[in-house]
A protein has these predicted regions:
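Intrinsic low-complexity, intrinsically disordered or marginally ordered coil/linker segments
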Residues: 1-88, 92-116
Length: 116
């Protein structure tokens, strides 16, 4: 399964410090479009959270054994590059948290819309 991703810096008034949050999405959506949508949604609906800069962007694949590989850069964000090792670690952590809540990447992959 190959998808696009961005890692965005979030800061919450309720939580301590800043957090790097990976967001995975379908290849049909531009990196900038996803960032703009997330940023707008938080400005409108969550006044306790500030969406900061995009720290990295690119493409991600997750193989059948759960290995995460990140690469590339975003043209729509002006060449923001992926951070392969760090981003793979963040996404692996996200994947492990999903697995602990009975939602896993293999299930999502098997039910992904055509063309993603």
């Amino acid at each position: 399964m190959e998808m696009k991703y961005i890692v965005v810096e979030f800061e919450s008034r309720d939580a301590n410090g800043k957090h790097e949050v990976p967001i995975l999405f379908a290849n049909i959506i531009a990196h900038k479009g996803m960032y703009d949508s997330v940023s707008l949604a938080y400005r409108r609906y969550d006044h306790n959270c500030f969406v900061g800069n995009v720290l990295s962007a690119g493409f991600v694949s997750i193989d059948d054994k759960g290995k995460v590989t990140c690469w590339g850069e975003s043209e729509s964000l002006g060449g923001v590059k992926s951070r392969p090792a760090r981003d793979a670690l963040l996404i692996s952590h996200l994947q492990n948290n999903w697995s602990s809540t009975n939602v896993n990447m293999h299930h999502l992959r098997d039910h992904a819309p055509l063309g993603t």
